[in-house]
Amino acid sequence: MLNRLRQRSRDEGGFTLIELLVVILIIGILAAIAIPSFLNQKSKANDASAKELVRTAQTSAETISTDNSGSYATVTPAALNAVEKSIPIGKEPEGGGAWISAATGEATGYTVTATAGKSSGNTFTITNKEGVITRTCTVGGKGGCPLNEKW
């Protein structure tokens, strides 16, 4: 009985060093492919947040105009925040994300700019000049500015 157990323990084998190294190499290759992909996702998310935020600010600017007989002259970051409390202004919110970095108004139009978080740094701007609306993106880092700088 004891001899059988000894024989069985000699017959059992584990993984060889080569097999373990191949598995580690495969895991390393997969990580090298996946990690850069995941890191870029934060930049894309911050860009999407900035685009959504500048659209919200645009709606607030239109509300300000409606309240002021069609004039956009009082459009400022603080005025946008007074209309929509969820609009962060002036600096990046705690925990990261986008914020309204600039907002100016004239009688017949306005310009509102949102800056994506530090991982992207891109700025997204909506300008309304006498009813003609343009959207532009300025590259501040990596992320989602299209080639023609319009979004």
Each language-model region and where it sits:
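N-terminal single-pass transmembrane signal-anchor helix
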Residues: D11-F38
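Periplasmic/extracellular, small/polar-rich flexible segments of pilin-like filament-forming proteins
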Residues: T59-W151
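Residues at secondary-structure transition points
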Residues: E12, K44-A48, E52, E94-I100, ...
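Hydrophobic side chains within alpha-helical segments
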Residues: V22, A34, K44-A45, A61
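N-terminal leader/signal peptides at the extreme start of proteins
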Residues: M1-F15
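Aliphatic-rich helix starts adjacent to a transmembrane/signal segment
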Residues: S37-V54, N68
